């Protein structure tokens, strides 16, 4: 069976991405990261998602000394959602470069054909490492800088959500039976999602767009009157 490394944070997007890889017939090798993020609950979610798919191995990589972000530095406040067009303080320096590099090394070892990453350039927070040009550049690195690449057996970087809105992503998750009830998206990392941070707001807007009820609990839920049937467990 063909193998794929899946970058699994425990959030909505990475879990949907996992469902896409599963449906495509890949043997799944999820990779999660503890980089000192304040929302440690996502690691619990990632474990639950991996168990749901009965994967052979779920690896957790610890990366120390990652800073300069509201997600890793308690002295920087996580802001509520804004649309000012600026790169927000929740940007983690070089995060996807680090994650993909680890996934690439792991992928070469296990003989993976693909690496799945759940990034989107549509409904996203403005992070530069979530854009198509970033993925194209990293694929070039894979092609010219690895044994697999130069021998003609390159590892494909797949981002199936890249051009999907959050609502379209949620619809895809529902179609694939993705376990979104296990996921968390909140940057603040409380027992309940805050409902007002950038990530929560995009998630709630997506469920509203999809006409599907979000299966997780929020402190501030906003107007959810347009939601209909919840995703099934």
Curated annotation (Swiss-Prot):
Its cofactor is Zn(2+). Keywords: ATP-binding, Ligase, Metal-binding, Nucleotide-binding, Queuosine biosynthesis, Zinc. Gene3D superfamilies: HUPs. ATP binds at residues 8-18. Zn(2+) binds at residues 186, 194, 197, 200. Homodimer. It holds the Pfam family QueC. Belongs to the QueC family. Pathway: Purine metabolism; 7-cyano-7-deazaguanine biosynthesis. Binds 1 zinc ion per subunit. Its EC number is 6.3.4.20. PANTHER family: 7-CYANO-7-DEAZAGUANINE SYNTHASE. One of its GO terms (biological process) is queuosine biosynthetic process. The gene is queC. This is 7-cyano-7-deazaguanine synthase. GO terms for molecular function: ATP binding; ligase activity, forming carbon-nitrogen bonds; zinc ion binding. InterPro entries: QueC (IPR018317), Rossmann-like_a/b/a_fold (IPR014729).
């Amino acid at each position: 069976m063909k193998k794929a490394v899946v970058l699994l944070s425990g959030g909505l997007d990475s879990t949907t991405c996992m469902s896409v890889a599963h449906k495509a017939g890949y043997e799944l090798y999820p990779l999660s990261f503890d980089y000192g993020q304040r929302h440690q609950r996502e690691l619990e979610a990632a474990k639950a998602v991996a168990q749901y798919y009965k994967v052979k191995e779920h690896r957790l990589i610890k990366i120390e000394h990652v800073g300069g972000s509201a997600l890793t530095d308690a002295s920087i406040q996580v802001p509520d959602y804004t649309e000012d067009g600026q790169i927000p303080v929740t940007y983690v320096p070089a995060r996807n470069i680090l994650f993909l590099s680890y996934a690439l090394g792991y992928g070469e070892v296990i003989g993976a054909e693909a690496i799945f990453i759940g990034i989107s350039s549509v409904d996203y927070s403005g992070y530069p490492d979530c854009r198509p040009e970033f993925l194209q550049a990293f694929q070039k690195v894979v092609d010219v800088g690895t044994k697999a690449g130069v021998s003609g057996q390159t590892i494909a970087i797949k981002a199936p959500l890249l051009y999907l809105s959050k609502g379209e992503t949620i619809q895809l998750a529902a179609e694939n039976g993705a376990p979104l009830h296990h996921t968390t998206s909140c940057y603040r990392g409380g027992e309940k999602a805050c409902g007002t941070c950038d990530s929560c707001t995009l998630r709630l807007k997506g469920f509203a767009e999809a006409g599907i009820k979000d299966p997780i609990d929020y402190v501030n839920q906003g107007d959810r009157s347009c939601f209909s049937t919840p995703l099934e467990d």
